[in-house]
């Protein structure tokens, strides 16, 4: 049996595309060592400069490790964005494809030919997919592309306009995954709250939530990447009212200064953002995640200070911060740039604030009772079982370490009520109290 090595870089949306490719290549034996693989696939990220460099370095590194007569295949956003340049500058690569042909990867390998469709790939209920990284959780991609016009973002230039999957397609995929034992789902897209806008339906997510709740066997779900102008008050209230969708609110804000929100073409002012955030925060057991960019063209010292004060005071649970990356095909590319020195200085300042904010969020968990799902043996050692809070997304929000149990041996993928005993440098030590369900 031929062997396959696949490296998926970038976001969880890329991961879903990689899992689609694995589904098409199920005849191959997956291997952990690229030096033993007959086919090596790199699914690249082309979002910002650091991601582009990571993708190029990965390609060159894998070429160095590959065995003679193996195939090196490069796909994904970086290839779609820089197709002509990379095909000239990467003679190490055997086959190239972009973001439109994930379900034809088996065909291109068989025929040893490049493939570049004009449209972005959108999976259907018939798409074969091999879930990786968990036996109980899966990401569900509900749309591709984006209609927003953020000044800093090039994604619409290579992913295209919003294309939503039909609700029936998503429900069919969910039912199949539930039948295979999956019961925890994260719904993703470039802009999830614009779901079905392209089909003339506002608040399409509400209808999707209604349909998801009818499926027996789903224990928890969450929605990632809400966009401030497309996420309505009705949607937030529907999530809060749901018995399946947890009160996990992931909304990248990018800034809070009205001046910067206008320059960044975010479509909402700080008053609107704070109203939305306060509604989310009012939900029982709410968990708020966001992200900000520092050093975008036009950011004054006053804008930055306003952002820092807001991050310090609001009480987010998780915050990501990024240095502005100058990207071709964006409105910000031709604006007067903030110097690298100033950007790096601001990044260090806000990273310190963010670390303190996240530490407070972990600390307030001590003494709480939380529903958690066991994910396996912890990297901290054989005496700990790793788990995640049922509200959290997979991997990015933290780890719970269980070293005591009042309910016997713990089962992977099973849900338990735990008491949080201690915060150990952003990892929570916990005791399992009881098994919650037997599904």
Curated annotation (Swiss-Prot):
Family: Belongs to the methylthiotransferase family. RimO subfamily.
Residues of the MTTase N-terminal domain: 2-114
Requisite cofactors: [4Fe-4S] cluster
GO molecular function, one term: aspartic acid methylthiotransferase activity
Reported function: Catalyzes the methylthiolation of an aspartic acid residue of ribosomal protein uS12.
Name of the protein in question: Ribosomal protein uS12 methylthiotransferase RimO
Keyword Iron-sulfur on entry: yes
UniProt domain Radical SAM core: residue ranges: 132-363
Matching SUPFAM superfamilies: Radical SAM enzymes
Family matches, as PANTHER family: RIBOSOMAL PROTEIN S12 METHYLTHIOTRANSFERASE RIMO (PTHR43837), RIBOSOMAL PROTEIN US12 METHYLTHIOTRANSFERASE RIMO (PTHR43837:SF1)
Record-listed [4Fe-4S] cluster 2 binding positions: 146, 150, 153
UniProt remark on cofactor binding: Binds 2 [4Fe-4S] clusters. One cluster is coordinated with 3 cysteines and an exchangeable S-adenosyl-L-methionine.
UniProt entry tagged with the keyword Metal-binding: yes
Residue sites binding [4Fe-4S] cluster 1 per the record: 11, 45, 77
GO cellular component: cytosol
Family annotation (InterPro entries): Elp3/MiaA/NifB-like_rSAM, Methylthiotransferase, Methylthiotransferase_CS, Methylthiotransferase_N, Methylthiotransferase_N_sf, Ribosomal_uS12_MeSTrfase_RimO, rSAM, rSAM_horseshoe
Compartment(s) where it occurs, according to its Swiss-Prot or TrEMBL record: Cytoplasm
Reaction catalysis annotation: L-aspartate(89)-[ribosomal protein uS12]-hydrogen + (sulfur carrier)-SH + AH2 + 2 S-adenosyl-L-methionine = 3-methylsulfanyl-L-aspartate(89)-[ribosomal protein uS12]-hydrogen + (sulfur carrier)-H + 5'-deoxyadenosine + L-methionine + A + S-adenosyl-L-homocysteine + 2 H(+)
Keyword tags: 4Fe-4S, Cytoplasm, Iron, Iron-sulfur, Metal-binding, S-adenosyl-L-methionine, Transferase
Family annotation (HAMAP family): MTTase_RimO
EC number(s) per entry: 2.8.4.4
Biological process terms in GO annotation: tRNA modification
């Amino acid at each position: 049996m031929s062997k396959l090595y696949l490296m998926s870089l970038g976001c969880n949306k890329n991961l879903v595309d990689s899992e689609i490719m694995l589904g098409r290549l199920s005849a191959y034996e997956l291997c952990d060592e690229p030096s033993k693989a007959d086919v090596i696939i790199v699914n690249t990220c082309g979002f910002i400069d650091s991601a582009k460099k990571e993708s190029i370095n990965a390609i060159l590194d894998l070429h160095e490790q590959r065995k003679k007569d193996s195939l090196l295949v490069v796909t994904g956003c970086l290839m779609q964005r820089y197709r002509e340049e990379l095909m000239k500058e990467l003679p190490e690569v055997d086959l190239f494809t972009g973001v439109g042909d994930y379900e034809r990867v088996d065909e291109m390998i068989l025929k040893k030919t490049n493939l570049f469709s004009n449209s972005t790939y959108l999976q259907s209920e018939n798409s074969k997919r091999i879930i990786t990284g968990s036996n109980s959780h899966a990401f569900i991609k509900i749309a591709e592309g984006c209609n927003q016009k953020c000044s800093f973002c090039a994604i619409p230039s290579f992913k295209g306009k919003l294309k939503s999957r039909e609700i029936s397609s998503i429900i069919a995929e969910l039912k199949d995954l539930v039948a295979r034992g999956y019961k925890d789902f994260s719904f993703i897209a470039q802009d999830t709250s614009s779901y079905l806008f392209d089909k003339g339906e506002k608040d399409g997510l509400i209808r999707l939530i209604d349909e998801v709740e009818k499926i027996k066997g789903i224990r928890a779900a969450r929605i990632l990447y809400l966009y401030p102008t497309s996420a309505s008050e009705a949607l937030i209230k529907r999530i809060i009212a749901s018995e399946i969708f947890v009160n996990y609110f992931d909304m990248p804000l990018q800034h809070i200064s009205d001046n910067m929100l206008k320059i960044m073409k975010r479509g909402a002012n700080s008053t609107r953002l704070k109203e939305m955030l306060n509604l989310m925060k009012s939900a029982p057991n709410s968990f708020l995640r966001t992200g900000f960019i520092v050093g975008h063209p036009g950011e004054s010292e006053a804008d930055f200070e306003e952002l820092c004060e807001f991050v310090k005071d609001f009480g987010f649970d998780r915050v990501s911060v990024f240095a502005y990356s100058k990207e071709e095909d964006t409105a910000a590319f031709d604006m007067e740039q903030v110097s690298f020195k100033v950007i790096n200085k601001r990044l260090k300042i806000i990273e310190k604030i963010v670390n303190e904010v996240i530490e407070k969020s972990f600390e307030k968990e001590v003494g709480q009772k939380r529903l958690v799902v066991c994910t396996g043996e912890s990297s901290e050692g054989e005496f700990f079982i790793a788990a995640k809070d049922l509200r959290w997304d997979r991997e990015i929000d933290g780890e719970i370490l269980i070293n005591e149990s009042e309910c016997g041996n713990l089962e992977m993928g099973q849900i338990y009520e735990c008491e949080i005993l201690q915060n150990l440098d952003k990892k929570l030590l916990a005791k399992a109290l009881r098994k919650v369900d037997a599904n």
